[in-house]
Amino acid sequence: MDSRTGELLTAAQSENGVYIWTVKNPLYFKITKHHERPFLRNHDIITIQVQFNYNLRKALGIHKCFLTCQIWTRLHPQTSHFLRVFKYQFIKYLDRLGVISINNCIRAFSHVLYDVLNGTIDVIEKHDIKFNIY
């Protein structure tokens, strides 16, 4: 949903993409939170945010695009190591597809968390997307 207007995204907006080799460093990755064994449970909660860079947003007609995932995992990784592996696998998946779009990024989340990384318990995805109105 477009967080500015409240309208649902159309299929054309979510599938609109650009070739991965036309944009340098198209995505920014950062871990915003890492709760290690909260409440003495046997899992970690990691929050990852993926941001589209300026050139990618310009090509797609997007004002702002933050894709955030809150991951419950049985793994107990170091924050930097988890981010490095996640980023590498995410970009590798998109590189194999050849096109970066909002839907392909969401598919990459699912692929990396459920098919590549073992120990994923649950994932909550949140999106903050604003398209250019003008």
Swiss-Prot record:
<dbReference type="Pfam" id="PF01407">
    <property type="entry name" value="Gemini_AL3"/>
</dbReference>
<comment type="similarity">
    <text>Belongs to the geminiviridae replication enhancer protein family.</text>
</comment>
<comment type="subunit">
    <text>Homooligomer. Interacts with the replication-associated protein (REP). Interacts with host proliferating cell nuclear antigen (PCNA). Interacts with host retinoblastoma-related protein 1 (RBR1), and may thereby deregulate the host cell cycle. Oligomerization and interaction with PCNA are necessary for optimal replication enhancement.</text>
</comment>
<comment type="function">
    <text>Increases viral DNA accumulation. Enhances infectivity and symptom expression.</text>
</comment>
<dbReference type="GO" id="GO:0016032">
    <property type="term" value="P:viral process"/>
</dbReference>
<dbReference type="InterPro" id="IPR000657">
    <property type="entry name" value="Gemini_AL3"/>
</dbReference>
<protein>
    <recommendedName>
        <fullName>Replication enhancer protein</fullName>
    </recommendedName>
</protein>
<keyword id="KW-0945">Host-virus interaction</keyword>
